[in-house]
Amino acid sequence: MNKFKNIAVYGGGSFGTSLASLAAQNCNNVTLFLRDEAIAKEILHNKTNVKYLGDIKLPAHLQATTNLDIIKDFELIIIALPSYAFDDSIKLLKTHSISKDNTLLIATKGFARNPTALLSDRLKTLLPYNPTAFFVGPNLAKELAKNLPASASIASLDIDIANKIAYNLSSKIFTTNVSSDIVTLQVAGALKNIFAIKSGIDLARKQGENARATLIVAALKEIAILSKALGGMQKNSDILLEGVVGDLVLTCYSLGSRNTKFGYELGISSDKKKFLQEYKELAEGREALKLVLDLIKKYNLHMPIISEVASCVIPYVIPAKAGMT
């Protein structure tokens, strides 16, 4: 199977930088594209991204730039940006003349906005001709950057594209599996952050490990409910992929997860309204909640965990008996 001659990663946060580090294990021509000139220079000269990854050393041959004009020259472009920036970022790529020859790997987790939709559906209107796949896995950014063992699922409607990307990213310590169910992986990647908030709240309440295991099972059921409503889950076994079960378990069990941390700090807060107003860190699950509520309403779905978290995080959106006091 052919190797990509070069790989671009678009997004210089913790996850984007970690994915660039991962890609550089197998490819000698990897460039990280980001907006912050100072961080780009730091990566070039010091091989660190202290703001997002501390003092973790990045591969010596990893390049970094703020010049999007050259991104069209890369065979594989990995998109690793927050979901709220997805539309604008893809439109920006279009202005820099990427063509149907550029393969896209979407590592963004969440839903497109205005209107609420799967990222794959939004791409059909923005970049309909590019080979596209989705990357979801149980991956804490700092562990990826440290080259610790991990895995991920690569999904594409074109299974040959998924296999090629998997081949280019896999190694002895990073394993991949492929799937054609792009819907289930996208849904799982978005919802797991909301379930992690619930896990953090339960941790603050000292609910115990039995409750957390029960949450995992219930969360998988809700992932399946929304996935089927959006056209996924043609095979029940798709729920067992690393990008579904693995990512859900990792996110819900780790305080290294921004969303679990957010839920925990919300749970121990004595003034929840003030906490929610003043909390500045990005918690993707908080961002995704209103979008998921749109889909629940549109398809008339019963997803009680999502409703409970909404009652905690978006006061008065849904009157739920299980809401926090």
From Swiss-Prot:
Q: In which pathway does it act?
A: Membrane lipid metabolism; glycerophospholipid metabolism
* UniProt GO cellular component terms: cytosol
The entry's keywords: Cytoplasm, Lipid biosynthesis, Lipid metabolism, NAD, NADP, Nucleotide-binding, Oxidoreductase, Phospholipid biosynthesis, Phospholipid metabolism
This enzyme catalyses: sn-glycerol 3-phosphate + NAD(+) = dihydroxyacetone phosphate + NADH + H(+); sn-glycerol 3-phosphate + NADP(+) = dihydroxyacetone phosphate + NADPH + H(+)
The residues the record assigns to binding sn-glycerol 3-phosphate are K109, G137, K192, D247, S257, R258, N259
Show the GO MF annotations. Answer: glycerol-3-phosphate dehydrogenase [NAD(P)+] activity; NAD binding
The subcellular location is: Cytoplasm
Name its GO BP terms in alphabetical order.
carbohydrate metabolic process; glycerol-3-phosphate biosynthetic process; glycerol-3-phosphate catabolic process; glycerophospholipid metabolic process; phospholipid biosynthetic process
In its keyword annotation, does this UniProt entry include Ribonucleoprotein? no
Give the protein's biological function.
Catalyzes the reduction of the glycolytic intermediate dihydroxyacetone phosphate (DHAP) to sn-glycerol 3-phosphate (G3P), the key precursor for phospholipid synthesis.
* Protein known as: Glycerol-3-phosphate dehydrogenase [NAD(P)+]
- Species per Swiss-Prot/TrEMBL record: Rickettsia conorii (strain ATCC VR-613 / Malish 7)
Q: What is the lineage of its organism?
A: Bacteria, Pseudomonadati, Pseudomonadota, Alphaproteobacteria, Rickettsiales
